[in-house]
């Protein structure tokens, strides 16, 4: 347990299109014991704003009614959720338009109760944003893709702006781990059996100093894994 008495916790971003009640029941049991929370993950392709709304609303209903998940916003009374986009293609950010299709996705997510997106970083994918190692607000242009490519940093004492908060994980070049002994590998905060959290990786995570502006002593280190793959459990 930590100084506040909490267990280590994991955010389980479960894919809507792969729903299996017995899997969610087991994750729900872990969450009820204080080991994490359930959030929303989605893979889709050639979709529309209305199609996205239908998928998210249906899955929110399942998570809420059958698994006791998703907190309520005390101000609005609306259910809230965190989000990770499958294939990293948030807001139709792939140049070829695959694995999304919704240019106003950021607005739709905010409308449905999404409090923050946790998709990034995505490098070396071409969905990677220009803005890195940041916690910021993205303002959607409903007629263009990848509106989260830039944004306004979240800052202490400054009201929220834009449409959706984007919480990024560390992204850097690891000069201590080189491909062919020459080219530095991309550190994209992915943890798995084949990419273990070594000391040099953890040092890089800390050095990126992801924080809310005005509060530099609180560092946010968001790492991720495809935890349903048996070798990575």
Show which residues each predicted segment covers:
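Active-site beta->alpha N-cap acidic-glycine motif
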Residues: 1-33, 79-82, 105-107, 111-112
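Glycine-rich, often proline-containing surface loops adjacent to acidic residues and nearby aromatics
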Residues: 7-9, 36-41, 79-86, 219-223
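Acidic-and-aromatic substrate-binding clefts and catalytic sites of carbohydrate-active enzymes
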Residues: 11-24, 45-54, 88-100, 126-127, ...
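A cross-domain feature marking catalytic cores of carbohydrate-active enzymes
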Residues: 12-16, 40-44, 85-87, 118-120, ...
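Generic structural signal for well-ordered alpha-helices
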Residues: 24-28, 56-64, 106, 206-209
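Substrate-binding cleft of extracellular glycoside hydrolase catalytic domains
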Residues: 32-66
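Active-site-adjacent pocket scaffolds in enzyme catalytic domains
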Residues: 71-219
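Extended, histidine- and acidic-residue-enriched regions that form the cofactor-binding/catalytic faces
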Residues: 220-233
């Amino acid at each position: 347990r930590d100084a506040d008495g909490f267990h280590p916790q994991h955010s389980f971003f479960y894919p809507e299109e792969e729903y299996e009640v017995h899997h969610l029941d087991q994750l729900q049991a872990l969450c009820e014991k204080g080991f994490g929370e359930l959030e929303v993950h989605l893979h889709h392709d050639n979709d529309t704003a209305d199609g996205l709304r239908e998928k998210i609303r249906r899955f929110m209903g399942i998570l809420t009614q059958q698994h006791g998940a998703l907190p309520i916003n005390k101000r609005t009374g609306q259910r809230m959720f965190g989000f990770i986009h499958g294939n990293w293609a948030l807001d139709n950010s792939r140049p070829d338009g695959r694995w999304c299709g919704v240019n106003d996705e950021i607005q739709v997510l905010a409308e449905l109760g999404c409090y923050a997106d946790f998709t990034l970083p995505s490098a070396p994918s071409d969905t990677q944003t220009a803005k890195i190692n940041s916690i910021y607000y993205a303002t959607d242009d409903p007629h263009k893709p990848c509106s989260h490519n830039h944004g306004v940093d979240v800052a202490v004492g400054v009201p929220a702006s834009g449409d959706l908060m984007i919480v990024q994980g560390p992204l850097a070049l690891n000069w201590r781990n080189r491909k062919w002994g020459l080219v530095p590998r991309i550190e994209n905060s992915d943890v798995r059996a084949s990419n273990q959290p070594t000391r040099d990786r953890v040092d890089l995570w800390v050095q990126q100093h992801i924080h809310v502006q005005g509060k530099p002593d609180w560092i946010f280190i968001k790492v991720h894994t495809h935890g349903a793959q048996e070798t990575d459990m």
